[in-house]
UniProtKB/Swiss-Prot annotation:
Belongs to the zinc-containing alcohol dehydrogenase family. Class-I subfamily. Its main location: cytoplasm. This is Alcohol dehydrogenase 1. SUPFAM superfamilies: GroES-like (SSF50129), NAD(P)-binding Rossmann-fold domains (SSF51735). One of its GO terms (biological process) is retinoic acid metabolic process. The keyword Zinc applies. It comes from Geomys bursarius.
Length: 375
């Protein structure tokens, strides 16, 4: 029996208040309005940005259903939707692409003005929610809201992908993999034969290492305080691994000494202010490029000596690896299907959705790279 046009009752993980576990609840998901799409989520990844909401580092209205990295199948569409149809495999886009705003039209920009990133309204574009639970409206997250068996997104926040692609793997392209990989190949524009460093070897950092390798870097130095991550980093392309705790000097000085004055490209993937500065300082002073990938805490400010930049270093940042979702995500899925890069080594656990809190415990304990939840 068709569910189009009807309210769907399904399971979702609701965060009622910060610093509390997720609660598996039955929620009601309203039908999509005009230019909206309702998606049956098949697989969704647990991202550290979701945990930043749980611990209060990222502010978003609560109660909310989090989740922003997923793959699913279109269940129904609202009036006026033309780019997807029921039955299509899709990836929701937490960075939308309207194609009309100034950012979307610029070839080097991807921050569509309609995105919820940074504004944290917790609603769809019309200012309302499609979720209710126990008679109360529940907020969306980043316009995609994937910790729910069904979700509703704006048409500009979803893209169709290869019908044969495995959603439990390509869901990583919805955030973490693209963020790291694109930071290397698209934002940093790593050059063949160059020297790169990546501060932190978590899932996004490993994806940046994959990107550096794909771009032809000659040396890729992984920096992490957890030596257990080094084997995986080397498996995916790191040529050297460095633990800052093994030295009695700042890590940027260690890297400068290892590379005859500094690396050509560095990537900060933690989101700490001190490591952002360190990643910049480890770059070669006349031409080094440092890319901020990690999400910093709210209301934090950096103080820098401008001479560090005046000498010739460049400091860049990007969200979602600089990718335009509708244009680039289908291409990334196609590249994965063509075996141009791996995703499997990044997935350490596949859990049923009900084990979401166990997945977050593993993330916080540093015992997982990526946990994927399946419905």
């Amino acid at each position: 029996m068709s569910t189009a046009g009807k309210v769907i009752k399904c399971r979702a993980a609701v965060l009622w208040e910060k610093n509390k576990p997720f609660s598996i609840e039955e929620v009601e998901v309203a039908p999509p309005k005009a230019y909206e799409v309702r998606i049956k989520i098949v697989a969704t990844g647990i991202c550290r940005s979701d945990d930043h909401v749980v611990n209060g580092s990222i502010i978003t209205p609560l109660p909310a259903i989090l989740g922003h990295e997923a793959g699913g199948i279109v269940e129904s569409i609202g009036e006026g939707v033309t780019t997807v149809k029921p039955g299509d495999k899709v990836i929701p886009l937490f960075v939308p692409q309207c194609g009309k705003c100034r950012a979307c039209k610029h070839p080097e920009s991807n921050l569509c003005k309609h995105g919820d990133l940074g504004r944290a309204q917790g609603t769809l574009m019309d200012g309302t929610s499609r979720f209710t639970c126990k008679g109360k409206p529940i907020h969306h997250f980043l316009g995609v809201t994937t910790f729910s068996e069904y979700t509703v997104v704006s048409e500009i926040s979803v893209t169709k992908i290869d019908a044969t692609s495995p959603l439990e793997k390509v869901c990583l392209i919805g955030c973490g993999f693209s963020t790291g990989y694109g930071s290397a190949v698209k934002v940093g524009k790593v050059a063949r034969g160059s020297i790169c460093s990546c501060v932190w070897s978590g899932r996004v950092g490993l994806s940046a290492i994959i990107g550096c390798k794909a771009a032809g870097a000659a040396r890729i130095i992984a920096v992490d305080i957890n030596k257990d991550k080094f084997a995986k980093a080397k498996e995916l392309g790191a040529t050297e691994c460095v633990n800052p705790q093994d030295y009695d000097k700042p890590i940027y000085q260690v890297l400068q000494e290892m590379t005859d004055g500094g690396v050509d490209f560095s990537f900060e993937v933690i989101g700490r202010l001190d490591t952002m500065v360190s990643a910049l300082m480890c770059c070669q002073e006349s031409h080094g490029v440092s890319v901020i990938v990690g999400v910093p805490p709210n209301a934090q400010s950096l103080t820098m000596d401008p001479m560090v930049l005046l000498s010739g270093r460049s400091w860049k940042g990007a969200v979602f690896g600089g990718y335009k979702g509708k244009d680039d995500v289908p291409k990334l899925v196609a590249d994965f299907m063509a075996k141009k890069f791996p995703l499997e080594p990044l997935i350490t656990n596949v859990f049923p959705f009900a084990k979401i809190n166990e997945g977050f415990d593993l993330l916080r304990a540093g015992k997982s790279i990526r946990t994927v939840l399946t419905f």
